[in-house]
Amino acid sequence: MNPAWALLRLASPQLPIGGYSYSQGLEMAVENGRVADAASARRWISDQLLLNLARFEAPLLLAHCQAALEADWPRLAQLCEEHRASRETRELYQESRQMGYSLQQLLNGLPELDDAARRFLEQHTEPHLALGWALAARAWRISPADALAAWLWSWLENQLAVLMKTLPLGQQAAQRLTSELLPLLQQAQQDASRIDPNPLGSAAFGLSLACMAHERQYSRLFRS
């Protein structure tokens, strides 16, 4: 099978895990005026990419994928604990848990998941997105680097979808923004691959505050 097909499958918005229903604080940033147009949206997404994802979320995901590929189950279990402890708000915790559960349900119904990975999933009754993504990459024979690229693209695509629903930003403007942000995806992937995952730490205060405020936002399009 062409390996590109598996990669496209993992990155597809049709993957039934519900990523489209979350904004990761962006809806609140639009509500309070921090993000009001394409330029401010670019700044918000760039900061999230390079200051949060590249330094913490992406290296953590990469470590999950590497441990799953090598069948290092004790290491993967440790990473699961670190991931769970790093969710700074209830919204982010529930988002990762719900998407991880949906991905677990998907993988359990597919023949590609091997017995060892299936047993590991059965032992972890509280799944999360990074774990599901790593085991999907293992099942579909996707390298950790490619799995990270798919995850970064999926994140960016979802953020742009949020913008088109909350701002007067059309599809062509979103595509122009995509062209501007693609080099940052490459930079985020490279930065993440150079970071030692032992230990990792995050200090994304702006994101945490936006997510906490979003939990109490009066009118919302996206889940909290």
Swiss-Prot record:
Keywords: Chaperone, Cytoplasm, Nickel insertion. InterPro entries: UreF, UreF_sf. It comes from the Bacteria. One of its GO terms (cellular component) is cytoplasm. It holds the Pfam family UreF. It is found in: Cytoplasm. GO terms for molecular function: nickel cation binding. Its main location: cytoplasm. Disulfide bonds: none annotated. UreD, UreF and UreG form a complex that acts as a GTP-hydrolysis-dependent molecular chaperone, activating the urease apoprotein by helping to assemble the nickel containing metallocenter of UreC. The UreE protein probably delivers the nickel. Belongs to the UreF family. Required for maturation of urease via the functional incorporation of the urease nickel metallocenter. HAMAP family: UreF (MF_01385). This is Urease accessory protein UreF. The gene is ureF.
